[in-house]
Swiss-Prot record:
Protein's name in the database: Peroxisomal membrane protein PEX18
Location relative to the cell: Cytoplasm; Peroxisome membrane
Gene3D superfamilies: 6.10.280.230
One of the GO BP terms on file: protein import into peroxisome matrix
Key words, A-Z: Cytoplasm, Membrane, Peroxisome, Ubl conjugation
Organism of this sequence: Saccharomyces cerevisiae (strain ATCC 204508 / S288c)
Biased composition (Acidic residues): 180-200
Transmembrane stretches, start-end: none
Gene name linked to the record: PEX18
Length: 283
């Protein structure tokens, strides 16, 4: 029995296949469906770390990575808030809302601040370069100053002054200088003459006042005689009567300094000691 069951008879297999009828493919549909279901079914994961990783990736795929912000247009920026139109049939609540509408609603911040554009700010922030890096789009090396270390040689005058013209100029300057000196000398002499005459008149008046004071205030005859016999009173008397006058010494070859002193009008001799210069040094 057992041996017969284990043996395979090819004839029996052929007969059994013919009894079933022609092949329609329905027998294999179930097997194909089973294979497809196995392929579509999620794999059996025994590792917990791998399971968490796949779950996290699914969450990332489902969530949006960025928010699409609709850019603002000129219509949005120029939009003005307006209250609803007045209606006779509106309720008291609508009337109160219309009255308090400007107080309850505030305009957007871009309408309050002039020259504010949020889109420009976002665009510029995206195009900014990192710290320390700059765009080289308009870079031009010719715009930088170039230091020239060349040493220039000094050259002489291309057209030197003619020596003949130089000599004529020097001669003209020397002539002008000499004429100016002569004018200064004449002016000094004129001024000295007038001042000398004024000083002589003042000296005569002073000498007369001294003599008059001594004569009137000397009660003692002995004192009066001593004053009259002194050289000082004799000089004051000669100055007051005009016998001694002031004279200017023009100097000599040995002594070029000029002096003003008393001299006798008739003889022209100096009254008193001769003038001597004192040197500014110690012997």
């Amino acid at each position: 029995m057992n041996s017969n069951r284990c043996q395979t008879n090819e004839v029996n297999k052929f007969i059994s296949s013919t009894e079933k009828g022609p092949f329609t493919g329905r027998d294999n549909t179930l097997s194909f469906n089973k294979i497809g279901s196995r392929l579509n079914s999620p794999p059996i994961l025994k590792d917990k770390i791998e399971l968490k990783f796949l779950q996290h990736s699914e969450d990332l795929n489902q969530s949006r990575s960025y928010v699409n912000i609709r850019p603002r247009t000129l219509e949005d920026q120029s939009y003005k808030f307006e209250a609803p139109n007045l209606n006779d049939n509106e309720t008291s609540w609508a009337k109160d809302f219309r009255y308090n509408f400007p107080k309850n609603v505030e305009p957007p911040i871009e309408n309050q601040i002039a020259n504010l554009n949020i889109n420009n700010g976002l665009r510029t922030s995206q195009t900014d370069f990192p710290l320390g890096f700059y765009s080289q789009k308009n870079f031009n090396i010719a715009s930088f100053p170039v230091v020239d270390h060349q040493i220039f040689k000094t050259t002489g005058l291309e057209h030197p002054i003619n020596s003949h013209i130089d000599s004529l100029i020097n001669a003209e300057f020397s002539e002008l200088e000499a004429s100016s000196l002569e004018e200064d000398v004449h002016t000094e002499e004129e001024n000295s003459g007038t001042s000398l005459e004024d000083e002589e008149t003042a000296m005569k008046g002073l000498a007369s006042d001294i003599i008059e004071f001594c004569d009137n205030n000397s009660a003692n005859k002995d004192v009066k005689e001593r004053l009259n016999s002194s050289k000082f009173m004799g000089l004051m008397g000669s100055i007051s009567d005009g016998s001694i006058v002031l004279k200017k010494d023009n100097g000599t070859e040995r002594n070029l300094q000029k002096h003003v002193g008393f001299c006798f009008q008739n003889s022209g001799n100096w009254a008193g000691l001769e003038f001597h210069d004192v040197e500014d040094r110690i012997a």
